[in-house]
Curated annotation (Swiss-Prot):
The keyword Coiled coil does not apply. Possesses an unusual extended V-shaped dimeric structure with each monomer consisting of three distinct domains arranged along a curved 'spinal' alpha-helix. The N-terminal catalytic domain specifically recognizes the glutamate moiety of the substrate. The second domain is the NADPH-binding domain, and the third C-terminal domain is responsible for dimerization. The keyword Oxidoreductase applies. It catalyses: (S)-4-amino-5-oxopentanoate + tRNA(Glu) + NADP(+) = L-glutamyl-tRNA(Glu) + NADPH + H(+). It comes from Koribacter versatilis (strain Ellin345). Keywords: NADP, Oxidoreductase, Porphyrin biosynthesis. This is Glutamyl-tRNA reductase 1. The gene is hemA1. Belongs to the glutamyl-tRNA reductase family. Disulfide bonds: none annotated. InterPro entries: 4pyrrol_synth_GluRdtase, 4pyrrol_synth_GluRdtase_dimer, 4pyrrol_synth_GluRdtase_N, GluRdtase_CS, GluRdtase_dimer_dom_sf, GluRdtase_N_sf, NAD(P)-bd_dom_sf, Shikm_DH/Glu-tRNA_Rdtase. Its EC number is 1.2.1.70. During catalysis, the active site Cys acts as a nucleophile attacking the alpha-carbonyl group of tRNA-bound glutamate with the formation of a thioester intermediate between enzyme and glutamate, and the concomitant release of tRNA(Glu). The thioester intermediate is finally reduced by direct hydride transfer from NADPH, to form the product GSA. GO terms for molecular function: glutamyl-tRNA reductase activity; NADP binding. NCBIfam families: hemA.
């Protein structure tokens, strides 16, 4: 079988947060997935991209069907994938997979079109795969090109300027419940980049009392210095939650950090005044049951998606221009990728022709006697020139075919006519 680019995954378009959080992967779990799956049948190169809005396996594979099955078997064994989950997953191949990867890196496939966070997440996923030794020359080329496309999209369109970010939607939802945010007390649970962005947005809209809660107090202190707030360890959070008007939670805890009983205690301490809780973590930090507590207004990633879809006209104009750039870049890269795919066959053909020429030269020497040095050099140069003419002509023909199906047919014909072994693993390529 010929090597293929494959993406297997799910995202916010195909699944609610309750499903996505089951397949979310921490950095450690991503390393484990990389090391396990790269040894699986059919998978030659692998990148795992896991964010709050998507979990995707980007594969360069010598057997697309077997590779996709290997991913599903892994998810079944490690994450309890059930038959009822299958409808949330997609499998994309070749041109469709390439377009998808470019759209993801350019934030055209994001919940918030134009949001900048995906670029860093994309780079981190690639760096992690490189560190794990699971990428080679093909996926490295794909990932590098995707980031180049992303940069061009941001430089040549207004896609970033038009983004309605998750921190922005946090402010909008808070204002809907609480009105103006002047003097509102804010608790940020988690000290990541998303929490920092949310803090800046909230402060720009009047919030002045910021409390940063984190499992690692040192990180909370570093964060609080940036925003002029106070730092609190996670285990000491209770009294600070009791006085919060807005709670934004984005930790990486594997369990709920605010449960229904916590919300009931908070509301008792607040006298039932309205409180906004924004859960931007996947897996979720806040038990959905807190919605049953009077006065609690809980918003999770599904709610933020609904807000992000409003007033999309400006972003859609920028997205149209971005899609044109993407199509142009994908076309050029696709040609390059198709040319790369036939290299192993051309190399095998050259080796085969060289072997035939050596055999024929040896037969000629035995028949005519030893050549002089000049004759030997001339005959060797002649056979090398013949090899170059034949292999070069076929290489140009194979590389310039517009459709993969035609390329596959001619490649197989060359392999059969010249008795070449199908170089499956060589075609996948590794560093």
């Amino acid at each position: 079988m010929e090597p293929s680019l494959v993406v297997v995954g799910l995202n916010f378009k195909t699944s609610p947060v309750a499903v996505r959080e089951r397949f979310w992967m921490s950095e450690l779990r991503r390393y484990e997935a990389l090391h396990q799956l790269v040894r699986a049948e059919g998978i030659d190169e692998l990148v795992v991209l896991a964010t709050c809005n998507r979990t995707e396996f980007i594969l360069w594979t010598s057997d697309a069907g077997e590779a996709a099955d290997s991913v599903l078997r892994f998810l079944t064994h490690e994450y309890g994938l059930k038959m009822s989950d299958w409808s949330h997953f997609y499998r994309l191949m070749d041109d469709v997979a390439l377009n998808h990867i470019f759209r993801v890196a350019s934030s055209l496939d994001s919940m918030v079109i134009g949001e900048p966070e995906i670029v860093g997440q994309f780079k981190n996923a690639w760096s992690q795969a490189q560190a794990a030794g699971t990428t080679g020359r093909f996926l490295d080329a794909v990932m590098q090109k995707a980031l180049t496309v992303s940069k061009r999209v941001r430089n040549e369109t207004a896609i970033g300027n038009a983004a309605v970010s998750i921190p922005y939607t946090t402010v909008e939802l808070s204002k809907q419940v609480l009105g103006e945010l002047f003097d509102k007390a804010v608790v940020l649970m988690g000290a990541g980049k998303m929490s920092e962005s949310a803090a800046k947005y909230l402060m720009n809209h009047g919030a002045s009392q910021i409390c940063v809660i984190n499992r690692t107090l040192h990180k909370a202190q570093e964060f609080s210095e940036k925003v002029g707030g106070i730092a609190v360890a996670l285990e000491d959070r209770a009294p600070y939650l009791d006085h919060a008007d807005i709670i934004v939670s984005s930790t990486s805890c594997p369990h709920y950090v605010i449960e229904k009983a916590d919300a009931e205690r908070i509301q008792a301490a607040r006298g039932g005044k309205p409180i906004v809780m924004v859960d931007i973590a996947v897996p979720r930090d806040i038990d959905p049951a807190v919605r049953e507590v009077p006065g609690v207004h809980l918003f999770d990633m599904d709610d933020l998606e609904k807000v992000a879809k409003r007033n999309e006209s400006e972003r859609q104009v920028a997205a149209v221009a971005a899609e044109e750039i993407l199509a142009d870049e994908a076309k050029g890269f696709r040609r390059k990728l198709m040319a790369e795919r036939v290299v192993p066959t051309i190399v095998a053909l050259r080796n085969r022709l060289d072997e035939v020429c050596r055999q024929e030269l040896e037969s000629l020497r035995q028949e005519l006697g030893p050549f002089t040095e000049d004759q030997d050099q001339a005959m060797t140069a002649l056979t090398a020139h013949i090899t170059q003419r034949i292999a070069g002509s076929l290489a140009r023909e194979l590389k310039e075919l517009p459709e993969r199906s035609e390329q596959d047919m001619l490649t197989m014909a060359v392999q059969r006519l010249f008795h070449l072994e199908q170089p499956q693993k060589a075609a996948a390529g590794t560093n």
